[in-house]
């Protein structure tokens, strides 16, 4: 922080105010916190998301699962969100015609039998 303040004062010739120095300090703290959070592994976060309570073994969430589910690529929810139930209309049409064909065969068997 002092390095930024001295660089600013040398460049402009003016000593920075306490507001600016506090602003620099806040930015530096936020950057360091962000770096620490980036180092954590998402899989480790996912494991620590649900823990057992000591008294009666009830589960409670620590709040990290929101970030972990986003960063794990093999999430079970991803294929259902990305792909529709039937990929193309032709496949949907073929499946529905197959479905109705089997019903018609069943009706024919029932009526003839």
Swiss-Prot record:
Keywords of the record: Mitochondrion
Name of the protein in its database record: Uncharacterized mitochondrial protein AtMg01220
Domain of life: Eukaryota
UniProt source species: Arabidopsis thaliana (Mouse-ear cress)
Location within or outside the cell: Mitochondrion
Cellular component terms per the entry's GO annotation: mitochondrion
């Amino acid at each position: 922080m002092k390095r930024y303040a001295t660089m600013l004062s040398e460049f402009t010739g003016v000593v920075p105010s306490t507001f600016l120095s506090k602003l620099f300090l806040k930015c530096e703290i936020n950057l360091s916190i962000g770096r620490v959070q980036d180092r954590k592994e998402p899989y480790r976060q996912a494991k620590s998301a649900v823990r057992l309570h000591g008294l009666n073994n009830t589960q409670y969430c620590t709040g990290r699962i929101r970030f972990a589910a986003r960063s794990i690529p093999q999430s079970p929810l991803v294929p259902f969100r990305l792909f529709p139930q039937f990929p193309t209309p032709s496949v949907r049409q073929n499946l529905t015609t197959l479905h109705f064909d089997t019903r018609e065969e069943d009706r024919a068997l029932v009526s003839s039998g």
